[in-house]
Structures are given as structure tokens and as C-alpha cells.
């Protein structure tokens, strides 16, 4: 494993397993981990639903019911309108991002060392420190925002909102520029917020691992405990902002 200096060590842990060049570069580790964790989420919820009983629920059933009720109640309070897609979408976003973030608690050297022993030089197990992953999530939300804008306002209403709000027809070019910037800023902020928080947390774990072992325990343990709060919080923020953006997009035009 590359690690002759502290800089080499840090760069090694922040480098993806990639194939291809330029625009067609694929981060294989991010794809493997994100799809694997997505499949794990689907399997756990399928298993919980399959084992659901009317009697005393199992631990997995309790967890699934708790998550579904929590997300459903949150979306009902936040999303103004009716849509059968919002609650399942919010549940998927929260659980998927939570599982991806949870990989940050895996010991920093464990998986890279195992992969290096297997002949793989680089392997990052935390997908949310890859901008490609966070932007893929936020761009998907962006397209949903556009779709819900057309659904809620119609093509004419959406165009009118872009062109004539907030300053009326006399400032049409300014309105258009302002609204386009606001629209594009939503997926960018969603992506960078998640990436920035998780990247900073991962970097701190890497820096702690460079210290003597007795200092690692003294600093790493409280940071890991604090990070247990950050992991679900970032997933919740991404979910909530998605629901809020879709609710705003779905609002009917007021006359």
C-alpha cells in the first residue's frame, strides 16, 4: 500500500479505483459500494415486510415500521399536495444515504489493506466522498423538480414563473437569469453539502490514523461518537431538502 509519507497515505485513502480516461472515467469502488448498499436496503425492507406479522413484531419489522412511519409522517407535514411517489422516494433517499455514510465508521485501514492484499491498489468504501455520487443523487432530484414543476403548474405556468417572477414582465431577462440560477443552485448545494461534510469527516479520520495508537484512541473515539450524529443528520437534511424542493415545484400557480 502506498504510504511512504503522510501525504502519500492521505492521497492513497482519497483515491478511487478508476477505469477509463477523461470524461469516461468510472469510479468502480463507488459504483460497487453504492449499488451494494442500495441492494442491502431493498433486501432488508423486503425481508422486514415479508416477515411482518400481526402478533409480536420482530426487531427487523420494528425497524422497518419505524422508518416507514417516520418518513411518511415527515413527508405529510412537509409536502404540500398529493403524490404517491414522495414518501417512497424520501424513504429511499434517507436510508440509502444513511447506509453510504455509515461506511465512514469502518476502520480506515481495514478494507484498503484487504483490497491491497488482493492486488487492488485503491478502494474507497465511502461513496459520499465521491462528487460523482453526490452529484448523481442531486441531478436526479433536479430532474424530479423539473417534472413536478410541469405537473403542478403546467408548461405555461412554469414558463410564466421563470419569465415573470419575481419582478414582473418589465424585468423579464433579469427574472429568467435569477430563476435559472436559483434552479441550478438547488442540486449543486445538495451535492456539495453532503460531499463537503462527509469528505471533511473522512479526512479527520485519516489524519487521526496517522497519530500514535494511544492518541488515536483518545481522539478517534469521541470523533466517531460525534460522527454517529452526523451520519443520519446529513441523510435527513438531503431528504428534507428534496421534499421541500419538490413541494415548492408542485405548488399550483396562484392568480
Curated annotation (Swiss-Prot):
The keyword Cell membrane applies. Keywords: ATP synthesis, Cell inner membrane, Cell membrane, CF(0), Hydrogen ion transport, Ion transport, Membrane, Transmembrane, Transmembrane helix, Transport. CDD domains: ATP-synt_Fo_a_6. It is found in: Cell inner membrane. GO terms for molecular function: proton-transporting ATP synthase activity, rotational mechanism. GO terms for biological process: proton motive force-driven plasma membrane ATP synthesis. One of its GO terms (cellular component) is plasma membrane. The keyword Membrane applies. Its main location: membrane. The chain crosses the membrane at residues 28-48, 86-106, 125-145, 164-184, 203-223, 224-244. It is a multi-pass membrane protein. Belongs to the ATPase A chain family. Key component of the proton channel; it plays a direct role in the translocation of protons across the membrane. HAMAP family: ATP_synth_a_bact (MF_01393). F-type ATPases have 2 components, CF(1) - the catalytic core - and CF(0) - the membrane proton channel. CF(1) has five subunits: alpha(3), beta(3), gamma(1), delta(1), epsilon(1). CF(0) has three main subunits: a(1), b(2) and c(9-12). The alpha and beta chains form an alternating ring which encloses part of the gamma chain. CF(1) is attached to CF(0) by a central stalk formed by the gamma and epsilon chains, while a peripheral stalk is formed by the delta and b chains. This is ATP synthase subunit a.
Amino acid at each position: 500500500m502506498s504510504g511512504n509519507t503522510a501525504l502519500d497515505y492521505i492521497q492513497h485513502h482519497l483515491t478511487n479505483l478508476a477505469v477509463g480516461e477523461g470524461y469516461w472515467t468510472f469510479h468502480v469502488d463507488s459504483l460497487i459500494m453504492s449499488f451494494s448498499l442500495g441492494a442491502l436496503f431493498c433486501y432488508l425492507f423486503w425481508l422486514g415486510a415479508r416477515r411482518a406479522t400481526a402478533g409480536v413484531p420482530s426487531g427487523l419489522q420494528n425497524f422497518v415500521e419505524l422508518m416507514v412511519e417516520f418518513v411518511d409522517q415527515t413527508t405529510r407535514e412537509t409536502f404540500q399536495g398529493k403524490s404517491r411517489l414522495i414518501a417512497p422516494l424520501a424513504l429511499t433517499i434517507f436510508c440509502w444515504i444513511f447506509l453510504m455514510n455509515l461506511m465512514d465508521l469502518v476502520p480506515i485501514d481495514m478494507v484498503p489493506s484487504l483490497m491491497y492484499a488482493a492486488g487492488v491498489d485503491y478502494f474507497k468504501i465511502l461513496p459520499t466522498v465521491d462528487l460523482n455520487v453526490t452529484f448523481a443523487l442531486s441531478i436526479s432530484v433536479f430532474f424530479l423538480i423539473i417534472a413536478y414543476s410541469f405537473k403542478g403548474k403546467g408548461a405555461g405556468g412554469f414558463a410564466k414563473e421563470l419569465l415573470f417572477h419575481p419582478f414582473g414582465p418589465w424585468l423579464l431577462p433579469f427574472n429568467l437569469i435569477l430563476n435559472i440560477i436559483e434552479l441550478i443552485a438547488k442540486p449543486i448545494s445538495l451535492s456539495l453539502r453532503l460531499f463537503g461534510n462527509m469528505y471533511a469527516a473522512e479526512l479527520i479520520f485519516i489524519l487521526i490514523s496517522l497519530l500514535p495508537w494511544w492518541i488515536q484512541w483518545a481522539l478517534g473515539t469521541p470523533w466517531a461518537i460525534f460522527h454517529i450524529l452526523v451520519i443520519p443528520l446529513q441523510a435527513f437534511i438531503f431528504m428534507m431538502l428534496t421534499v421541500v424542493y419538490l413541494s415548492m415545484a408542485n405548488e399550483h400557480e396562484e392568480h
